[in-house]
Structures are given as structure tokens and as C-alpha cells.
Amino acid sequence: MDRWQGIQHVVVVGLGITGLSVVNYLRKYHPSVTVQVIDTREAPPGQEQLSSDVALHRSGWNLEWLLNADLVVTNPGIALATPEIQQVLAAGIPVVGDIELFAWHVDTPVIAITGSNGKSTVTDLSGVLANAAGVKAAVGGNIGVPALDLISPDVELYVLELSSFQLETTSSLKLKAAAFLNLSEDHMDRYQGMEDYRQAKLRIFDHAETAVVNADDTQTFPDHAAHLQVVTFGVEQAAQFSLAQHQGREYLFARDEAVMACAELSLVGRHNVANVLTVLALLDSAGVNFRLALDALKSYTGLTHRCQVVADNHGIKWVNDSKATNVASTLAALSGLKIEGQLYLLVGGVGKGADFTPLAPVLATLPVQLCCFGVDGHQFMPLHPSARFYDSMESIIRSIRPQLKSGDMVLLSPACASFDQFKNFMARGDIFAQLARQYA
């Protein structure tokens, strides 16, 4: 069936790197289609890269364009509940995202990953190990390169990170294997509650052959699994991909096979052991022989902005975990820590309506000074008696620098989004790393 039959006029809502990837894809593969772009921002990012023959409407909506479209492609950041998008849907005009266009185009095997935390590490490591095993993999989606920019005839496996926002507008993505890593409170400003958020994530299994789920978090299990093969991973509960003692050491196990000692991993933290087990389960389900890539697994140190040591001088560790944009990410970082001295924990930013109280019992067990900043930083103040509020990240570091001593750790794991004071979490992490090197 030709999905494009009768589609002559496409409106792309939201520019940026995803919107640009949609425009470039349409111009390359569907040159006869007329493309218009709507972006409600005054200066949409990427507008200077837009071809002069693509009409752009800025600083607001253009309902005339929307209601005359044959297809509307929205940016994942735009909720389907937005009144203008609701009008489009009410008019019977299909609304999709870039991942749905990708799904219409490719017939090469695809694996995909969703979850509240750990998605980027699992996605990146899956690509690294697939390539090391001799399978040409292309990695992207919600991480790095937009999915449509990955399309190439020589790719043998696509590895996509998918957010709940992307899954909302995706309905026909066929997957060799799909992983749902975990579920914790996030984006409560967008969803009606946790079950609403969970249902968006579960869409990843709609057309998957294998569901890779977390035995330690049953909320990741599909509600309807008749069409699926279900494979489990876990570090606490019994699972097909799990941990067990072998020759006196803790080993990663794939089904009943001892794969590698945990001590041989370069990755730090218990949450990363779970991430590795997920990758093994995904690749195995997709027919990739991960055993050919164990050297690459041993040497893999993880992604920037995710529990990354950016400076280690005079015995003081500076750790950039800027990607921790919700409470569960920060809890994961704290659970994997080994600290000899004092922990200086930097938290705050845009809270997205989250409840931060689950941090309190964990903080109570740690030698911590809580350093709060950002628009919702004050919400962390009741969590620990050491809490102090600062007007910026730099003022925190200037203030604590004279008291730092060997064995201490300065950890940026904010449990919040960054866009109150920074362009994005990467910019926040880069500035932290720069300050760490300056003051270390």
C-alpha cells in the first residue's frame, strides 16, 4: 500500500533539527509534495537552513495552512492536545511525527528503546556493539541524529531511541525488538498521570516482534502480549538476562550462559549493569551475535553528561550527570556512588511538576551538602537540613570550592530540566565541566 497516495500538501509543525530532517526527507524522497512549515517561535532554530522554496510561517499558528493540508507532521515537543492540532484531527487530517514517516519508508530491521531513564546509553551501546559485531548499525531518533537523517541503503540495522512524545504520533513502526527500560514520574506537565504516560510508552510494542522488559519494574510489561515474544532483563528479580555468581564473581548472564564478569565493565553504577543486560537482550533478539563484541563492551565508558567524571584533581571528583532531568535519574546516580568524603549535590532547574520527596530518604543516608539553584530549586530545600539556595551553578561552585578536600565529590545531577538558565541539558553539562576544570 502506498502511504503517499493522495498526499500533495504537507505542513510541518515545528522546525529545529527534527523539523529540518522532515523537510529534507520530503524534498529528497517526495519532491512533488508541497511543503509548508509553521513554527510559533519568533526565530525558529534552523530557519537559515530552510530552502527558499519552502514557505515558513513564524510567531504563531496558521490555521488556513493546517486545514488545507493532506498530512500534518508535528514536532514531538507539540502535544496532540494543543487546540490547533485538535482542530486538524477533528477535520479528519492525519497527524504524524517523523518516526511514522521513517516507519513508512524503511524495511531494514529496526530495534528501538524507550523508558524514563537510561534510553540514550542503551541506544548508543546497542549501536556500538552491533557495529563491533560486524553489523552496520545507524543510531539516532531522540538521541543525536533524527531518524529520517539516518536513512541509507547500506544500513543493516537501525537503532532508535524513542521518547513517549515521539510514540504518541507513531502507529506503524515494525520492530525486530523493542525495549521498555523503566517507568518513573516525568513529563507530568504533559500527561494526565502515570498511567497515561505509561500507555504512551507501551505503544512501542504495537508492531514489535519481541518485547524486552524489566523484571524489576513490572510496569514495563505489555498489557496485551499475544503477538509478542517477551524477553526479560533484571538485576534483582529472576530474568532471562540477569546477574548470577560464577567462579566466585558476579557475572552477566544471557539466558543460562555466563557472558562476562561485571568487574570487567568500564561503566559505573548498578543502573548501567541493567542497561548492559538490556543491550544484550535486544541484540540477541535481533539476531546480532553480541559475543563478537565483548571487547567493545569492556571498553565502553558511556555517554557525555551521564555520570561522567569531568575532572579528578587532588582526590576531588567532579561528575557531570546533567542528563538527570528527573528524580529517578538522580536516584539512579546516587545509588551507584562510592564516596570517601563529602558529596556536594547540585540540584534544580525546571521541575516539570515532579514530586522531589523520594530523594529525602536517600539523602539522609549520605554525607551530603545539597546545593539548590534554578527556577524550582527552592522545592529541594525541605529535603535535607544542609540545603542552601544559590542563584546560579557558578555561584555554587565558587562558594564550595574553598572547603573541598580529597575524597569529596561534586555531582551535578539536577533532577530537573535545564531550560530556565540553559539552552538544554548538554549546555548545562558543558558549563559544569568548564567550571570544574577551572576550579578543580
UniProtKB/Swiss-Prot annotation:
Primary location class: cytoplasm
GO biological process, one term: peptidoglycan biosynthetic process
Swiss-Prot/TrEMBL keywords: ATP-binding, Cell cycle, Cell division, Cell shape, Cell wall biogenesis/degradation, Cytoplasm, Ligase, Nucleotide-binding, Peptidoglycan synthesis
The protein's Enzyme Commission number: 6.3.2.9
Gene Ontology CC annotations of this record: cytoplasm
Pfam families reported in the protein's UniProt record: Mur_ligase_C, Mur_ligase_M, MurD-like_N
Reaction catalysed by this enzyme: UDP-N-acetyl-alpha-D-muramoyl-L-alanine + D-glutamate + ATP = UDP-N-acetyl-alpha-D-muramoyl-L-alanyl-D-glutamate + ADP + phosphate + H(+)
Molecular function per GO: ATP binding; UDP-N-acetylmuramoylalanine-D-glutamate ligase activity
Origin superkingdom: Bacteria
First-level EC class: ligase
Pathway(s) of this molecule: Cell wall biogenesis; peptidoglycan biosynthesis
InterPro entries per the UniProt record, alphabetical: Mur-like_cat_sf (IPR036565), Mur_ligase_C (IPR004101), Mur_ligase_C_dom_sf (IPR036615), Mur_ligase_cen (IPR013221), MurD (IPR005762)
Localisation: Cytoplasm
Binding site for ATP: G115, S116, N117, G118, K119, S120, T121
Family under the similarity heading: Belongs to the MurCDEF family.
General function of this protein: Cell wall formation. Catalyzes the addition of glutamate to the nucleotide precursor UDP-N-acetylmuramoyl-L-alanine (UMA).
Protein name: UDP-N-acetylmuramoylalanine--D-glutamate ligase
